[in-house]
């Protein structure tokens, strides 16, 4: 950095400090105004004295009722009381005008503070990173005022004062709309000002949506400024965007410059006036700005916009709120930074609220994920499956705040899986009519709760029942694709969280060994049944019949279409493909030492059969570009798929969504609708083959699919983000999170300290209300040295040490999780898949005696088992015989 640049950076830093200190001073004034406004809402003036509004309202209603009940009979004193009532109404009108005046002061003060703090983000990114300005702005200004109005509206609704309630709702909606406008315009300004290539599709979308309306309503255009007429389109957009959200820039273009530069000679101003052309010219705001922080600002803004739309939905329709718009912005955030995990938690909160207030959906049968008849309790658990899966995903995210908050929400949601029985009955008991999903969740609820060890010992029959129901439901095609994906997310996340059940504050493992075994065995059982069911749908006849060389012209040109014959119409196979893709992606990035022999054998057989099919039908193998399109089918796929990311952003996915005019960028909020079922299953099969092929190439033995164990790291640490340069500020505000502090009955006894109020979060989930916790500032994450890449963020979730053990220096030489789950026999009854060596060590090496089916001829030779040099390899002989069988059947 040159001396001039250093001087300019010092000037911009001091300017930001000045604005930050001024905004901090105004916050005390805002707090005082809110207190006065609260007093105005809760009291009225009677005879020159303030009295509680509830008491005054009761007396007024009682007198009106007395007059109406005796309207035919003259009542003594009624005529004389009319002037008094008129005076009281006049005083209330004066009080109402005073309230409106105070609200105007609050609104203008909030705009001024927003203008000061928002300007620092654009003046000096380094300063905003150190102070975490965006979180500070949301927590101390926007969320504080929103929470204030939510409480006042609730109090007014209990006081039966329609006039006060109507005025408060109007003010609340006005403030929410202004907050949405600020964050939406901030995203457009960041994209227009810094030209982030990784976010160009998203920022282009916001700029195109925000700019036309902003330019038409801009004061610069209304005043007919000469600068406006001579400026370029980009400069016009910037000027209009600045003038729409910054109070100081609503009069002249020079005020925009003063807001961002602070002095006429500063060259760090993004907007500068050219004396020759008398127009605005663009200059970079900083030479050392951090793109990672700007990406995080965009991500946070999307989360905040989704939160505000959630509050709007609650105000407009308290009984049955529509969270569709909020869900749309959370999905946008997932496409920007899928590894941050906050969007999963917010989506889980929405699913909890929808499950509470969706009686009409359950009555129509649309919320059920099974095609059979299930009882009311099963329907309730099926409705809870999306929320539990989102909480599971958020719990394993590298974001400390999101993970610790989601663990509490997850525990509360799993407790509800036990039903309404509080008589101490055995939770392992079940009804024969119970569905596979409800019992599947029941197993994890038992494992992740402080259930008596005797109950866990009795879980053998329940375990076998779940295995049987899963197998029968998969083979019968009773599961939908979304249900299987959600169950897959639960299974993978539960395996990650299982080693952390029962850790004490000292880092020592408590009596949770049975819980650990039950959680891990449930996960392995699920994937064993899943892989076996997929193999049963891939027989030789299905892989060789019905293949046509005709190419469908209606198929998307972005992905080359392959012909899969009769598999394209297999409705039973289709829902099981994406869950296997998720499993393969997880093992590809984080290791697969936990896989049992049956899972490894099943995956190798699926890969061999698909390879044989493509080889013998003379079709080109798909490439990894198909993963971009496949990842748009579920936001959980973005979290697991090995997509190319720039600053944590899957840019290819954003580009495909933007240029394809698909969700979440369209206003209707509808996903990419593909009516052709052949196209859907083709994408899924291509993605599965690509992932299995990548996994085979990344391991020395393509059949065993073994990989070295995952490094010992804490899943809830911030190490993944220090590699991005994001260690000096908090990753995300927890304004809308339930408490991060584990409850006394929670199985997670350690973790990140809580900064939220626990009681309100529990009430939020128990009573179905979206009550956000009032929290303080987020503690920054200490910087740690790491060499990880952005692409391996999820790897932090696979760990053998507790968070408390990492912080205190305590390390365990060996843990149950460090070994394969196949080394543990079932608690009650052994499974054939749980095989071990005589010495108890797991079989993570070559699979002895495994038969490789449908191996393509030109594939590399396998080293699974040794053969004499004089004999040809067995898989070549088998492939030749299979090919002759195919030729005979065709002739």
UniProtKB/Swiss-Prot annotation:
Gene3D superfamilies: Tetratricopeptide repeat domain (1.25.40.10)
Xref: Pfam families: EST1, EST1_DNA_bind
Biased composition (Polar residues): 810-822
Cellular component GO terms held in the UniProt record: cell division site; cytoplasm; cytosol; telomerase holoenzyme complex
GO BP: nuclear-transcribed mRNA catabolic process, nonsense-mediated decay
Record keywords, A-Z: Nucleus, Phosphoprotein
Region (Disordered) residue spans: 48-86, 795-822
GO molecular function: telomerase RNA binding; telomeric DNA binding
Main subcellular location of this protein, as a coarse class: nucleus
Basic and acidic residues compositional bias, start-end: 48-64
Residue numbers of Phosphoserine PTMs: 261, 263, 265, 268
InterPro entries, per the entry: DNA/RNA-bd_Est1-type (IPR018834), Est1-like_N (IPR019458), Est1/Ebs1-like (IPR045153), TPR-like_helical_dom_sf (IPR011990)
Localization: Nucleus
Name used for this protein in its record: Uncharacterized serine-rich protein C2F12.03c
């Amino acid at each position: 950095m040159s001396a001039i640049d250093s001087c300019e950076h010092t000037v911009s830093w001091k300017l930001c400090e000045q604005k930050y200190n001024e905004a901090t001073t105004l916050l005390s004034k805002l707090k005082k105004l809110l207190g006065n406004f609260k007093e105005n809402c809760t009291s009225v003036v009677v005879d020159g004295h303030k009295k509680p509004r509830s008491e005054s309202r009761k007396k007024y209603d009682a007198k009106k009722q007395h007059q109406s009940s005796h309207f035919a009979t003259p009542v003594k004193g009624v005529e004389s009381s009319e002037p008094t009532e008129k005076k009281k109404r006049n005083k209330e009108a004066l009080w109402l005008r005073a309230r409106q005046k105070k609200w105007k002061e609050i609104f203008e003060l909030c705009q001024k503070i927003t203008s000061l703090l928002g300007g620092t983000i654009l003046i000096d990114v380094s300063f905003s990173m150190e102070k975490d300005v965006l979180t500070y702005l949301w927590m101390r200004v926007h969320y504080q005022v929103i929470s204030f109005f939510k409480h006042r509206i609730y109090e007014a609704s209990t006081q039966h004062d329609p006039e006060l309630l109507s005025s408060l709702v109007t003010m609340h909606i006005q403030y929410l709309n202004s907050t949405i406008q600020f964050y939406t315009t901030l995203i457009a300004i960041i994209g227009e000002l810094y030209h982030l290539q990784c976010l160009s599709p998203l920022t282009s979308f916001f700029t195109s949506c925000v700019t036309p309306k902003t330019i038409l309503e801009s004061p610069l255009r209304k005043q007919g400024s000469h600068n406006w007429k001579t400026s370029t389109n980009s400069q016009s957009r910037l000027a209009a965007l600045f003038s729409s959200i910054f109070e100081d820039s609503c009069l002249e273009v020079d005020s925009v410059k003063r807001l961002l530069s602070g002095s006429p000679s500063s060259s760090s101003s993004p907007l500068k006036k050219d004396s020759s052309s008398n127009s605005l010219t663009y200059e970079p705001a900083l030479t050392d700005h951090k793109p990672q922080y700007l990406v995080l600002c965009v991500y946070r803004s999307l989360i905040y916009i989704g939160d505000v739309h959630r509050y709007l939905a609650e105000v407009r329709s308290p009984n049955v709120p529509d969270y569709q718009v909020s869900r749309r912005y959370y999905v946008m955030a997932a496409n920007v930074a899928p590894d941050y995990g906050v969007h999963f938690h917010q989506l889980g909160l929405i699913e909890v609220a929808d499950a509470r207030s969706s009686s009409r959906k359950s009555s129509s049968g649309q919320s059920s994920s099974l095609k059979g008849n299930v009882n009311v309790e099963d329907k309730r658990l099926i409705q809870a499956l999306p929320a539990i899966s989102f909480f599971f995903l958020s719990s394993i995210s590298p974001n400390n705040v999101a993970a610790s908050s989601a663990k509490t929400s997850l525990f509360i949601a799993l407790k509800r899986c036990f039903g309404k029985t509080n008589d101490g009955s055995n939770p392992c008991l079940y009804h024969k009519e119970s569905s596979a999903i409800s019992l599947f969740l029941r197993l994890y609820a038992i494992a992740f709760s402080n259930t008596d060890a005797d109950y866990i010992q009795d879980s053998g029959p329940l375990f076998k029942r779940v295995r049987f129901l899963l197998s029968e439901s998969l083979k019968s095609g009773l599961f939908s694709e979304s249900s299987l994906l959600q169950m897959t997310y639960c299974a993978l996340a539960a395996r990650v969280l299982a080693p952390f059940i029962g850790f004490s504050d000292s880092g020592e493992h408590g009596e949770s060994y049975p819980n650990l075994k039950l959680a891990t065995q449930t996960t392995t059982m699920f994937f064993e049944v899943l892989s076996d069911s997929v193999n049963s749908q891939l027989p030789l006849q299905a892989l060789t019949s019905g293949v046509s060389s005709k190419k469908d012209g209606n198929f998307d040109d972005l992905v080359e279409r392959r012909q899969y014959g009769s598999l394209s119409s297999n409705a039973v196979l289709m829902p099981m493909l994406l869950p296997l893709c998720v499993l393969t992606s997880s093992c590809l990035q984080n290791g697969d030492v936990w896989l049992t022999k049956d899972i490894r054998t099943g995956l190798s057989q699926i890969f061999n059969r698909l390879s044989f099919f493509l080889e013998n039908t003379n079709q080109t193998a798909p490439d990894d570009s198909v993963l971009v399109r496949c990842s748009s089918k579920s936001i959980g796929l973005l979290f697991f798929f090995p997509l190319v990311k720039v600053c944590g952003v899957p840019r290819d996915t954003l580009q495909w969504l933007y240029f394809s005019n698909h969700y979440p960028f369209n206003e209707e909020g509808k996903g990419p609708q593909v009516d052709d079922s052949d196209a859907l299953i083709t994408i899924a099969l291509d993605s599965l083959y690509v992932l299995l092929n990548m996994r085979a190439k990344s391991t020395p033995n393509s059949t065993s699919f073994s990989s070295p164990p995952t490094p010992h790291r804490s899943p809830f640490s911030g190490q993944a983000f220090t590699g991005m340069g994001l260690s000096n500020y908090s990753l995300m505000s927890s304004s809308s999170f339930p408490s991060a502090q584990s409850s006394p009955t929670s199985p997670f006894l350690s973790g990140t300290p809580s900064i939220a109020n626990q009681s309100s979060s529990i009430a939020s989930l128990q009573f179905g209300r979206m009550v956000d916790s009032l929290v303080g500032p987020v503690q920054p994450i200490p910087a740690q040295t790491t060499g990880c890449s952005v692409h391996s963020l999820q790897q932090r979730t696979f760990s053998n040490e507790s968070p408390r053990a990492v912080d205190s220096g305590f390390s365990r030489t060996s843990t149950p999780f460090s070994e394969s789950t196949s080394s543990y026999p079932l608690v009650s009854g052994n499974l054939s898949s749980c095989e071990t060596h005589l010495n108890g060590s797991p079989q993570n090496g070559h699979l002895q005696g495994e038969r490789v089916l449908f191996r393509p001829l030109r594939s590399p030779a396998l080293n699974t088992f040794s053969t004499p040099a004089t004999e040809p390899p067995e898989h070549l002989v088998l492939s030749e015989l299979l090919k002759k069988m195919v030729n005979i059947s065709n002739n």
